[in-house]
UniProtKB/Swiss-Prot annotation:
Primary location class: other
Region (Polar): 2-39
One annotated Gene Ontology cellular component of this protein: membrane
Membrane topology: Multi-pass membrane protein
Similarity section: Belongs to the oleosin family.
UniProt xrefs under Pfam families: Oleosin
Protein name: Oleosin S1-2
Keywords: Acetylation, Lipid droplet, Membrane, Transmembrane, Transmembrane helix
Any Gene Ontology biological process: post-embryonic development
Compositionally biased region (Basic and acidic residues): 142-193
Species, as recorded: Brassica napus
Highest taxon, organism lineage: Eukaryota
Functional description taken from the UniProt entry: May have a structural role to stabilize the lipid body during desiccation of the seed by preventing coalescence of the oil. Probably interacts with both lipid and phospholipid moieties of lipid bodies. May also provide recognition signals for specific lipase anchorage in lipolysis during seedling growth.
Length: 193
C-alpha cells in the first residue's frame, strides 16, 4: 500500500503593522507648521504680482507687434536685408568668439603640457646624471682593474727576467766567479724598479 507520511508544516506568524506612508508622511496629522503658513502667506502675493506683470508684458508685446506690423510691411525691403546683415554679423561675432575660445583653450593645454614636461625633465635629467655617474664609476673601476692587471703582469715579467738573469749569471758564475752574479741581479732589480 501507499506509504503515508506526515510532513511537518512550518507556519510563519507576522504581526500586523499599520502602513505609515503615502499622504500622511507629506501632510502630518498635526497640521502645517508656522513656517509653512508664513511661506504661503508671503508667496501668494508675490506670485500673483509676478503673474500679473507677465500677463501685462505679453499684452503690451502683442499690441506693439500689431501696431508695428504695417511699418514692417512698408519698410520690409530695407528691414529684411538689414536683418540678414545683422544676422550674419552676429554669426561672425559668435564664430570669432568660438574660435578665440578654442585658441585660448588650446594655448592653455599647450602651456600645461609644457609645464608638465618641464617638471618631468629634471627627474629624467637626474636619472641620466645618475646613470652617467654609475657608468663613469664602472669605467673607472674597470680601468683600475685593467691597470692592476697590467701592473701584475709587468711585475711577473720583471720577476721572470730577474730569474732568467740569475739563471744566466749562475751559469756564468760557475764559469767566472760568484761576485759577478750578485751584481747583475742587483742591477736588474734596480733597473726594473
Amino acid at each position: 500500500m501507499a506509504d503515508v507520511r506526515t510532513h511537518a508544516h512550518q507556519v510563519q506568524v507576522h504581526p500586523l503593522r499599520q502602513h505609515e506612508g503615502g499622504i500622511k508622511v507629506v501632510y502630518p496629522q498635526s497640521g502645517p507648521s508656522s513656517t509653512q503658513v508664513l511661506a504661503v502667506v508671503a508667496g501668494v502675493p508675490v506670485g500673483g504680482t509676478l503673474l500679473t506683470l507677465a500677463g501685462l508684458t505679453l499684452a503690451v508685446s502683442v499690441i506693439g507687434l500689431i501696431l508695428a506690423f504695417p511699418l514692417f510691411l512698408i519698410f520690409s525691403p530695407v528691414i529684411v536685408p538689414a536683418a540678414f546683415v545683422i544676422g550674419l554679423a552676429m554669426t561672425g561675432f559668435m564664430a570669432s568668439g568660438a574660435i578665440g575660445l578654442t585658441g585660448l583653450s588650446s594655448m592653455s593645454w599647450v602651456l600645461n603640457h609644457i609645464r608638465r614636461v618641464r617638471e618631468r625633465i629634471p627627474d629624467e635629467l637626474d636619472e641620466a646624471k645618475q646613470r652617467l655617474a654609475d657608468m663613469a664609476e664602472y669605467a673607472g673601476q674597470r680601468t683600475k682593474d685593467a691597470g692592476q692587471t697590467i701592473e701584475d703582469k709587468a711585475h711577473d715579467v720583471r720577476e721572470s727576467k730577474t730569474y732568467d738573469v740569475r739563471d744566466r749569471d749562475t751559469k756564468g758564475h760557475t764559469a767566472s766567479g760568484g761576485d759577478r752574479d750578485t751584481k747583475t741581479t742587483r742591477e736588474v732589480r734596480v733597473a726594473t724598479t
